[in-house]
Amino acid sequence: MKNTIIKGLTDLVEQKRDNLIRQVVVQLEAQGYKAVLEQATVQQFCRQFALSPVEFALRCLPVAACYALTPISQFNVGAIAIGQSGSFYFGANQEFVAASMQQTVHAEQSAISHAWLAGEKAIAHMVVNYTPCGHCRQFMNELNSAERLKIHLPHSQNNLLHNYLPDAFGPKDLNIQNVFFDGQSHPFNYQGHDPLIRAAVEAASQSYAPYSQAFSGVALQLGELIICGRYAENAAFNPTFLPLQSALNYQRLQGLIDVKVSRVVMAEAKADLTSLPMTQSLAGAHLGLDIEYISL
């Protein structure tokens, strides 16, 4: 079966007949379909086409939407998180057959988690092809850049996040000072030699769980590669992003959807709640695998 991302990008180039889109797709192909444009590449495109970074990102939204996985809704949403570094991190919505609707990844979550795992320190702009839903507005309010974050839509640009979420409730209301995208370090010890377990423990140590202390991470084995995901809590609790979604999203945006996952390890700190049941459910439904669980 043909890679659905490659097929979507190929079809987009043929349908749009847009030189900018064609060149962006060529760039993605050259980097193995990793859905990121580094700052230097962004600057090069902006100079070539006489566009601002936000204008360029708006033109790239159909490309980002090609990374969507929407077997249920058939409604593809693309998002681009522009980091303070100037790099573009693409994201897209993802739905999982035979799993609950609550397991869905929203495009804004996708782009933000992508940037976080890539080491970005703050998000300056969110560019998305449809108005953010309430869930995503609350998710973005957890960011260390929430007060100055700008939202850009095809029909409306330069809107502060808090214009979409007035009188917002967030981490500061719960006396949390070190927020999402601020450095996280919660060292957990693992004395074994299994690199996949070690990677899951390291992901847990960098996760964001100020409300429950249920720090967790997931590591996926893809041939010789390891892909990790991190847990990220939210002041409103429900918009919390689970570590397996984070890992599957990163796998997709690294252009690795054709590489089979053979193992899933989850490492989680002991706390009053756990993400294990939902993680087990999604791993079984989407990957046909059991979770190897490490209690920290």
Swiss-Prot record:
Belongs to the cytidine and deoxycytidylate deaminase family. This is Cytidine deaminase. InterPro entries: APOBEC/CMP_deaminase_Zn-bd, CMP_dCMP_dom, Cyd/dCyd_deaminase_Zn-bd, Cyt/Deoxycyt_deaminase, Cytidine_deaminase-like, Cytidine_deaminase_bacteria. One of its GO terms (molecular function) is cytidine deaminase activity. Homodimer. It holds the Pfam family dCMP_cyt_deam_2. Residues 52-167, 191-296 form the CMP/dCMP-type deaminase domain. GO terms for cellular component: cytosol. Its EC number is 3.5.4.5. CDD domains: cytidine_deaminase. It catalyses: cytidine + H2O + H(+) = uridine + NH4(+); 2'-deoxycytidine + H2O + H(+) = 2'-deoxyuridine + NH4(+). The active site is at E108. Binds 1 zinc ion. Keywords: Hydrolase, Metal-binding, Zinc. GO terms for biological process: cytidine deamination. Its cofactor is Zn(2+). Zn(2+) binds at H106, C133, C136. Substrate binds at N93, Q94, E95. This enzyme scavenges exogenous and endogenous cytidine and 2'-deoxycytidine for UMP synthesis.
